[in-house]
Amino acid sequence: MSDSPIKYRLIKKEKHTGARLGEIITPHGTFPTPMFMPVGTQATVKTQSPEELKEMGSGIILSNTYHLWLRPGDELIARAGGLHKFMNWDQPILTDSGGFQVYSLADSRNITEEGVTFKNHLNGSKMFLSPEKAISIQNNLGSDIMMSFDECPQFYQPYDYVKKSIERTSRWAERGLKAHRRPHDQGLFGIVQGAGFEDLRRQSAHDLVSMDFSGYSIGGLAVGETHEEMNAVLDFTTQLLPENKPRYLMGVGAPDSLIDGVIRGVDMFDCVLPTRIARNGTCMTSQGRLVVKNAQFAEDFTPLDPECDCYTCNNYTRAYLRHLLKADETFGIRLTSYHNLYFLLNLMKQVRQAIMDDNLLEFREYFVEKYGYNKSGRNF
């Protein structure tokens, strides 16, 4: 895939770590890396408008193939002119393959060489997703970056199961490449699996790199393993991937995990965490996690985070946010979601600057101490 529509340009390597400052060029524009990608599951980042996402510095967003296939349907989106036009977003979009959603429906799925049979979570009907179908759906959606269909084995699965799984994922990746109808305007990433087994990660990476994908995702992490186990897997996995292609760590959004991923050479991250916790009034701030719904903030007329210059923090107080959330007002969720997304996007901006200044390890130490990870154990 040497004429890939997705290009990675390395700007600088950090002197003391594996961190890389760069940019990714796509048919819908260029974004700087390392980058956090807000998740727009149903072709919308919950409660946020496209204009707000641009305003907060989101260079790319993610949408879910599985959910859009079921509703409203990929063919309908194709008739609308593709996902960008359908949702009025003119910047890059990444779509997942649907594999993780199917994996999370563990009770109702059956995996064979052909693909996966499972129950539609909306109406209980029987569905079948194959590597070819996953690619076809994404071709209809028209995302800039697509994912190969993979199986995401649990981190603590037995070795023999994981070995069979990664070998099947490699065969599925090859089938997906052959089925790809739009290689000139949609890049396709391969997904490295292997749970916590170094030799299986090596085998998976070797298989996929030989297929020359536009970029490589690291899957099967943030699924219940410890923070230390994830870092250990990243330590050896990123080194197996080409220097001239993007590296994407799937499903990771806790602030320390983002920094630790960057230190180990990852360029892209996504997670529903910032919007999911915002709906419960949990906010990430420069001083750590804050649950603004708590009674102690009822008469707190200070900004959510005095060090943050986002729209929420510039205009509203903790007391007002608490009132909105307690009254079940959607505006409260909009404001906390905006802040959390801005916080992670701004964190990545600070990380990019730290790479430029060759002081990423010092920045990590400063951030972790201030955020309170050292005081209360690890907590997003």
UniProtKB/Swiss-Prot annotation:
Region span, RNA binding: 251-257, 275-279
HAMAP family: Q_tRNA_Tgt (MF_00168)
Chain's role: Catalyzes the base-exchange of a guanine (G) residue with the queuine precursor 7-aminomethyl-7-deazaguanine (PreQ1) at position 34 (anticodon wobble position) in tRNAs with GU(N) anticodons (tRNA-Asp, -Asn, -His and -Tyr). Catalysis occurs through a double-displacement mechanism. The nucleophile active site attacks the C1' of nucleotide 34 to detach the guanine base from the RNA, forming a covalent enzyme-RNA intermediate. The proton acceptor active site deprotonates the incoming PreQ1, allowing a nucleophilic attack on the C1' of the ribose to form the product.
Entry EC no(s): 2.4.2.29
Entry note: cofactor: Binds 1 zinc ion per subunit.
Keywords from the UniProt entry: Glycosyltransferase, Metal-binding, Queuosine biosynthesis, Transferase, tRNA processing, Zinc
Residues of the active site: 96 (proton acceptor), 270 (nucleophile)
Positions with a binding annotation for substrate: 96-100, 150, 193, 220
Record field: catalytic activity: 7-aminomethyl-7-carbaguanine + guanosine(34) in tRNA = 7-aminomethyl-7-carbaguanosine(34) in tRNA + guanine
Pathway the protein acts in: tRNA modification; tRNA-queuosine biosynthesis
Binding site for Zn(2+): 308, 310, 313, 339
Keyword Zinc: yes
Cellular component GO terms, alphabetical: cytoplasm; cytosol
Quaternary data: Homodimer. Within each dimer, one monomer is responsible for RNA recognition and catalysis, while the other monomer binds to the replacement base PreQ1.
InterPro entries hit by this protein: ArchSynthase1/Queuine_TRR, TGT, TGT-like_sf, tRNA_ribo_trans-like
Entry keyword annotation includes Metal-binding: yes
Gene Ontology MF annotations: metal ion binding; tRNA-guanosine(34) queuine transglycosylase activity
Protein's name according to its UniProt entry: Queuine tRNA-ribosyltransferase
Organism: Streptococcus pneumoniae (strain ATCC BAA-255 / R6)
Biological processes annotated in GO: queuosine biosynthetic process; tRNA wobble guanine modification; tRNA-guanine transglycosylation
Necessary cofactors: Zn(2+)
Pfam families: TGT
Domain of life: Bacteria
Family: Belongs to the queuine tRNA-ribosyltransferase family.
